[in-house]
Amino acid sequence: MKALSSSSPILGASQPATATALIARSGRSEWQSSCAILTSKVISQEESESLPVPPVSGGVDHLNGHNSAAARVPGMNLVPIEKSDSNPLVPQHRHNPLKPLSMTDLSPAPMHGSNLRVAYQGVPGAYSEAAAGKAYPNCQAIPCDQFEVAFQAVELWIADRAVLPVENSLGGSIHRNYDLLLRHRLHIVGEVQLPVHHCLLALPGVRKEFLTRVISHPQGLAQCEHTLTKLGLNVAREAVDDTAGAAEFIASNNLRDTAAIASARAAEIYGLEILEDGIQDDVSNVTRFVMLAREPIIPRTDRPFKTSIVFAHEKGTSVLFKVLSAFAFRDISLTKIESRPNHNRPIRVVDDANVGTAKHFEYMFYVDFEASMAEARAQNALAEVQEFTSFLRVLGSYPMDMTPWSPTSSTSS
């Protein structure tokens, strides 16, 4: 099947558009127009968007567009994934784990049926894979070796969606991913909250007293630090790219002095034993993921929605109080506020006749609030915010994850 390009129809749209579909597209156009109005003051940020990105082999012409038909990489093989009988939410890779996508693999791929292709960072057995399965139960999960690759997989039509962790209830925000949300032009179309159940894994026959190091993702290490100390594991901690990757590394290198912090599913895939189960410091350990797509969804008011924005001001953080008051005045609850350094202007120099020259850090502010962009109060709040800011961008307006969860219902499968 011909690879999708900028002129290709919407993925899976093999039938002529119905009247309902035309109405939906019209609504999406109106929503995109609204976003364009709210993000009109983004001249400085557009300059940053033009910064060079790491070259992608295979002759990709455009990164953020879809004109990449010439970027085919010989030998690329995206194999349909066999579903697990024990857990239908995640694919089965026990006998033949998929190789994660790398920068050199970013070329258009053929469609495989009607299932969504969802990119995630990590290898089979990663928590991001479980989040992809929870968000899209019938998806074809595509492992990627970097978060950047997951973004580009969607931009280049290799994947239809990406699932990205942004914060954890114990470890806090994943700052790298907030930076990527700003650098790329994907839209947040949903969120999913996943309880995290960590296990201590090692090769069969290995005992805890023989361990000399524990490896995992930095968040995994941070989330289990106190428990490891209580277990007497005062050994070296080493960070790797992801939790399941740590398990794979131990298995592939036959490391009998090393343990990994990962899921029970990773132990099953890579043939490891569980030395300790449930080693997270807090049983209510939850990671929040966002779902990303090339196009925004049409916001609604018939269910709880959340909206994510990012803004900055050329005169520093003094505008923050005014921005927050725009939401407080309209009784809009904020669920998150996060500051990140402004990479375009990291330092602001201020000359004052009384105190001399001072240097201040410049920040971008990420805010999540509980309201839909279809609501007048949200539109009015952002119109007021735009008056106070030099840069404002709506990252997405999307349904909140209202799925109940229990600390005992882990993602260990």
Curated annotation (Swiss-Prot):
A single cellular component GO annotation: chloroplast stroma
Molecular function terms, GO-annotated: arogenate dehydratase activity; prephenate dehydratase activity
Organism lineage string: Eukaryota, Viridiplantae, Streptophyta, Embryophyta, Tracheophyta
Transit peptide: 1-44
One Pfam family, short name: PDT
EC number: 4.2.1.51, 4.2.1.91
Protein name: Arogenate dehydratase/prephenate dehydratase 6, chloroplastic
Catalyzed reaction equations: L-arogenate + H(+) = L-phenylalanine + CO2 + H2O; prephenate + H(+) = 3-phenylpyruvate + CO2 + H2O
Species the sequence originates in: Arabidopsis thaliana
Gene this chain is encoded by: ADT6
Limits of the ACT domain: 308-399
Chief location category: plastid
GO biological process: L-phenylalanine biosynthetic process
Tissue: Expressed in roots, leaves, stems, flowers and siliques.
The protein's annotated pathway: Amino-acid biosynthesis; L-phenylalanine biosynthesis; L-phenylalanine from L-arogenate: step 1/1; Amino-acid biosynthesis; L-phenylalanine biosynthesis; phenylpyruvate from prephenate: step 1/1
InterPro entries: ACT-like_dom_sf (IPR045865), ACT_dom (IPR002912), Preph_deHydtase (IPR001086), Preph_deHydtase_CS (IPR018528)
Transmembrane segment boundaries: none
Prephenate dehydratase domain mapped to chain residues: 117-294
Compartment(s): Plastid, Chloroplast stroma
Keyword terms: Amino-acid biosynthesis, Aromatic amino acid biosynthesis, Chloroplast, Lyase, Phenylalanine biosynthesis, Plastid, Transit peptide
Its job: Converts the prephenate produced from the shikimate-chorismate pathway into phenylalanine. Dehydratase that uses arogenate and prephenate as substrates. Utilzes more efficiently arogenate than prephenate.
